[in-house]
Amino acid sequence: LVGSEMCIRDRYDLVIIGSGPAGLSAAVYAKRACLDVVVLEKEPMGGGQMIYTQEVDNYLGLPETNGFDLAQKFEQHAKALEVPFISDEVDNVEKNTDGTWKITGASGTVYETKTVLLATGAGHRKLGVPGEETLAGAGVSYCATCDGAFFRNKTVAVVGGGDVALEDALYLAAGCEKVYLIHRRQELRGTKVLQEQVANEPKITFLPDTVVKEICGEQMVDHLVIANTGTGEEKELPVSGIFIAVGMNPQTDAVASVLDLDHGYVRAGEDGVTEQPGLFVAGDVRTKKLRQIVTAVADGANSVTCLLYTSDAAD
């Protein structure tokens, strides 16, 4: 995602923070409603977590696609409507005395706007063990589809027990010599279909009741220190890479001072309305039961529609 060379408005109707499926959907609806809108995105490429999804087979009308391609289609749609994008990370969101909003970017730019839509999604949760930070990008990865090709014919580990971890293990097994699937519990949490596929893949070895204590290597990962959660027994596990898939953390630091968060998530219904008038939310960052591409897209549409009827953004 390349930041546009453009003049910053004195005041926007709507600033959308994040260009995942929720943010892009909202941008399309806002532009079609003739709002003066801009999308802020901190990552080099938009699309949110969707770009890391190897296969998307439940998005209506596109039974055989992947998250990266779908994200590109979403972004192309928004750009075809001339939605402006700016590459900037949001440090703070605060309310002005007149009820409008001020957004401060890491670039130092201040964006004034009548309304805000938070669509920042969630980021990768970390293990918090020695070696994770120092070896990031040197064998430590959070995206199998991004980095898996670097480990062809090598032995790797995947940490986690949910759908993402199982999908990562299966994806890596196609090119790696061996894949260890490490989970802190006895039973996996992923869907039964994925569990069966993992069980039937000879290259995958499941290590239940196991945690990673340390990620080791001089310049690149060469082994892990793992421990049994029951006995506490530790041992070394030789691997060339580790793929961490232990969940997500909502990206809400920028609004923590203006919203009462629920375990980091923004409290809101499908209309995206928060406790703060003029501040809306959409996608995985809000409290909800189902976090998928289709629900994020719906959130974006719903929040902008509600915004049009409940705020002065269109005035």
Descriptions of predicted regions:
Residues 4, 123, 128, 133-150, ...:
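FAD-site-proximal beta/loop scaffold in flavoenzymes
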